[in-house]
Amino acid sequence: MNTALNTEKHRNVFYCIGNHDLVKGKYGEELFESIYGPVYYSFDAGNVHYVVTPMPGGDHAPGYTSDDVCRWLKNDLAHIRPGTPVVVFNHDLLTYEDTFIFKSKNAGSINLNEYNLKAWVYGHWHINYMKKQGDVYSVCTSSLDKGGIDHSTTAFRVMHVDSKGDFTSELRYTYLDKNICIASPAGVMASGVLP
């Protein structure tokens, strides 16, 4: 796996493929893999198991299937100690429900809640949003370079994770240096319509 090293803080950077990273080639993730490495993998940091799963589809067809990912995910989670906190990264949100079930066409499914899932971290919506779905947090962050599609300011999220997999989250805003902007909605015209 090719992880970039943030030389200032000496921290690894792990990449997660998104829909626009699936580009023309022998298979959609070919370029991504040549630069960053595999599109699904896991690692441990402290007492927490982190899982990166690929976007199911995108601008071009991937070489992997939901069956491939599901089989791999089942195998990966079968090898962690029971009760280990799990955080999953995927470019898109898996579900709006309280139960996070990864489904495949022919390889069955896996209920991630049964593996002490703490958070599902995604970015496809390009908004700053965090919601508790049952016992699991879904966490989305806007685009670093242009902000959110909901006009939220460009930011990146810092998550501090403890040994139990519980976390705090803070947004750090970019391109702002003692800057404030106050917006005031326009009033109603004498005719009663908005300008």
What spans do the regions from the language model cover?
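Short acidic, glycine-rich surface-loop motifs adjacent to enzyme active sites
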Residues: H79-E97
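Short, catalytically relevant binding-site loops at active-site mouths
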Residues: G58, L93-Y96, I127, L176
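Proline-rich low-complexity regions
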Residues: N12, L93, P185-A186
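A short C-terminal boundary segment appended to hydrolase-like catalytic domains
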Residues: H160-P195
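Short, well-ordered beta-to-alpha junction loops that form the rim of enzyme active sites
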Residues: M55, F89-L93, H124
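Extended active-site neighborhood of metal-dependent phosphoesterases/phosphodiesterases
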Residues: M1-P85, K105-A119, I127-S163, F167-E170
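Active-site His/acidic residue clusters
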Residues: D98-F102
